[in-house]
């Protein structure tokens, strides 16, 4: 009888511990405005990447009620200084963490300038369906009405939601949940700067709970062909901006510098000024992959529209803007130099 009571007591204690166990969330800090400090609380002049991960966590103690939180500082930079080397380190570290049963989700604090690019890169290279959430702020940590603390709280709340699993990499900003592929920064100052493009937001956060309205359409994370685990560098890809009477010199400079690919941010439907077009044809013949995109803020770049892509072996970016087309082209070039296969990647991802 005593043995039975002891066993029941042990089971009760074990059940209690299991019920009280919180999800384990790792926060990786990379800098940005969320870690910035301004000259005064009312100033918009500030230095990004001044506050460390521990200070960020201590500023939002409420996240400790949501999850078992731990943090690490990968870098502490303004995201205008984000680069391929940091991307590779970040992707490898997240994959390492999520491969461990002791980590349920990862939150990445990041500057907003290039957050959409980092999010898309991770969306193509993370090999787990566990939640990965990018979060930042538009106001520095000591500003009046700083948005960083609320954004970080919402990001952790999203990370622990069972509904977030399998959603790909997300950006959590201003109470909204945005798809890594479609998210875009649209304003230099507004806290509501991030938008979801024509497809809109994936969901929102309210009272510490994530609510989803739709799922991502394109393949991501575990569904992609890209593996960066053994990569030490990425192919070199540049972007050339289109405009009236555009010069071919920037494109020629990329070719002369040995770049592997160039994204043309063309006018309208990815159209290219004649001198730049001629330079692009020559570049493609030299083995430099050309991707046509558009400088327009919305709308796809049509395959074989006004430009005969099949004839010149160009790739159309479809619904990717120039900066995200660059990300996908870099990864595509780690797998193939065949323009037809690269076009398929743009259709899939």
Task: Give the residues covered by each predicted segment.
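Hydrophobic h-region of N-terminal signal peptides that target proteins for export
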Residues: 8-20
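C-terminal non-catalytic interaction/assembly regions of soluble proteins
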Residues: 269-349
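Internal gly/pro-rich beta-alpha loop/helix module
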Residues: 135-207
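Short, acidic/small-residue loops that bind anionic groups at enzyme active sites
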Residues: 119-150, 156-160, 285-294
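Accessory alpha-helical/coil subdomains and C-terminal extensions
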Residues: 22-23, 28, 52, 56-63, ...
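ATP/NTP phosphate-donor binding region
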Residues: 21-96, 278
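Short Gly/Thr/Asp-enriched flexible loops that form oxyanion-binding sites at enzyme active sites
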Residues: 108-130, 272-281
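Bacterial N-terminal signal peptides that target proteins for export
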Residues: 1-8
């Amino acid at each position: 009888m005593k043995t039975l009571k002891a066993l029941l007591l042990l089971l009760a204690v074990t059940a209690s511990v299991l019920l009280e166990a919180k999800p384990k969330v790792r926060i990786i800090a990379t800098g940005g405005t969320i870690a910035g400090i301004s000259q005064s609380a009312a100033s918009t002049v500030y230095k990004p990447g001044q506050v460390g991960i521990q200070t960020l966590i201590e500023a939002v103690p409420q996240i400790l009620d949501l999850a078992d939180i731990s943090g690490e500082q990968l870098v502490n930079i303004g995201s205008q200084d984000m680069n391929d080397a940091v991307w590779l380190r970040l992707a490898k570290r997240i994959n390492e963490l999520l491969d461990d049963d002791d980590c349920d989700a990862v939150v990445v604090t990041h500057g907003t300038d290039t957050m959409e690019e980092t999010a898309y890169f991770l969306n193509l290279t993370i090999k787990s369906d566990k939640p990965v959430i990018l979060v930042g702020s538009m106001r520095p940590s000591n500003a009046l009405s700083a948005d960083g603390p609320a954004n970080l709280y919402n990001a952790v709340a999203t990370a622990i939601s069972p509904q977030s699993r399998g959603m790909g990499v997300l950006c959590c900003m201003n109470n909204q949940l945005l798809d890594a592929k479609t998210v875009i920064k649209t304003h230099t100052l507004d806290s509501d700067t991030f938008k979801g493009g024509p497809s809109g937001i994936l969901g929102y956060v309210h009272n510490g709970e994530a609510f989803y309205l739709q799922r991502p359409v394109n393949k991501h994370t575990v569904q992609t062909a890209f593996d960066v685990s053994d990569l030490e560098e990425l192919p070199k890809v540049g972007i050339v901006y289109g405009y009236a009477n555009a010069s071919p010199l920037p494109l020629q400079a990329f070719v002369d510098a040995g770049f592997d690919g160039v994204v043309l941010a063309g006018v309208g439907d990815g159209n290219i000024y004649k001198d730049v077009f001629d330079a692009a044809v020559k570049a493609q013949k030299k083995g430099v992959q050309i991707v046509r995109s558009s400088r327009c803020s919305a709308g796809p770049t049509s395959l074989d529209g006004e430009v005969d892509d099949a004839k010149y072996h160009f790739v159309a970016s479809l619904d990717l803007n120039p900066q995200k087309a660059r990300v996908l082209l870099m990864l595509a070039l780690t797998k193939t130099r065949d323009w037809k296969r690269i076009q398929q990647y743009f259709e899939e991802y």
